[in-house]
Design a protein with these regions (language model features):
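Hydrophobic helix-and-loop "lid/oligomerization" segment in the mid-to-C-terminal part
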Residues: 1-86, 91-121
């Protein structure tokens, strides 16, 4: 439950409410002794943000300190796989994911750029 509270506190909404994102760091997992299973449905937090079309969940796992995992959920007409595949990820049109080498700041910067390009069409 504490991981979800931390995710809610990280909620960031941008691009005129079209995009909502949350994040959990390695420290978040360690401090609350959270597991990957504890974070399974955290992607639903940004999906609940009113009016958003794209939900992003950035998280670092304790066993993979130099990577950031990203879960992507979209509503039509946006395609989640169009973003994830740019980073070697997979999935389908409404739900996809990828792993980006580097810090969370690097991953956010790269993913946000890809999402902005998707929104521009």
């Amino acid at each position: 439950m504490e991981l979800k509270r931390r995710a809610w506190r990280s909620l960031h909404i941008w691009k005129n409410r079209k995009v909502a994102e949350v994040s959990l760091t390695i420290d978040d997992f360690r401090e609350v002794r959270g597991t990957k299973a504890d974070a399974e449905d955290v992607i639903n937090i940004p999906r609940l943000a009113a009016g958003n079309q794209i939900a992003l969940f950035f998280h670092q796992l304790p066993d993979r300190t130099r990577e950031t995992r990203v879960s992507i959920r979209t509503r039509a007409p946006y395609d989640a796989i169009a973003v994830a595949s740019r980073f070697g990820g997979g999935g389908h049109a409404r739900a996809a994911g990828c792993t980006i080498k580097g810090s969370m700041a690097v991953a956010k910067r790269q993913l946000r750029r890809a999402v902005k390009e998707l929104l521009l069409g």
